[in-house]
Amino acid sequence: MKKIFAPVLAALMLLPLLCGCGTGTAEAELTTVRLNEVTHSVFYAPQYVAMELGFFADEGLAIELTNGGGADKVMTAVVSGQSDIGLAGPESCIYIYNQGKDDHPVVFGQLTACDGAFLMGREDVSFNWEDLRGKTIIGGRKGGVPEMTLEYVLRQHGLEPQKDVIVDTSVQFNMMAGAFTGGQGDYVTLFEPAATQVVTSGEGYILCSIGAESGAI
């Protein structure tokens, strides 16, 4: 049986709408689903709301949530059987499929329509994309949706990655905030709550939303 991997749990979240209101399921009868998410962020709020309001329990499901800390880590957990479902970008499924694997993960639903990262700098200034010319951005894992979306947005603003601006892909997803506050790079792209935590500490400022710049992907 093919392992099920997804960037979302929207398909499951729609079940209450399709099946009507649940009558409640005894805890002993719930089926545990091990869900590995790429990061714990308000970006995925619909999933947390569904869990908190008991929508999954109404359908006989108990969600066991784990923070994978990156799409590559999520995929490893799904492929190895440590998790049943992954919440991350679809790129990892494509990479596994392109390797010719018969038992490859599949995408079955969608929770978000754009990238959730924010571009952050060290100074609270009026931002212009030309400010990035000749600078270095910590952009995350090469080939990941956040990094690819960043490169797309840079090109849309006339900046060629690795020529006009360096996109550093050497830092793991869950280490990007620490690398930036530690002095690495001039800019960084971060999801919430890491972005707000950096702002609160006075070590960086949100300049723009990458998702707002790229649009739906």
List each model region and its residues.
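A bilobed periplasmic-binding-protein/Venus flytrap-type ligand-binding module shared by bacterial periplasmic
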Residues: 50, 116-127, 215-217
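Short, well-ordered beta-strand elements
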Residues: 28-41, 61-67, 134-138, 166-168
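Short, polar/charged alpha-helical segment
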Residues: 39-67, 96-99, 148-156, 198
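Pocket-lining segment of extracytoplasmic ligand-binding domains
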Residues: 92, 172-217
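Flexible hinge/capping segments at coil-to-helix
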Residues: 27, 121-137
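Short, low-complexity disordered leader/linker segments with a strong preference
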Residues: 1-32
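Ligand-binding "clamshell"
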Residues: 28-32, 96-108, 155, 197-211
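Short helix-initiation/N-cap motifs at beta->coil->alpha
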Residues: 65-76, 89, 161-182, 190-193
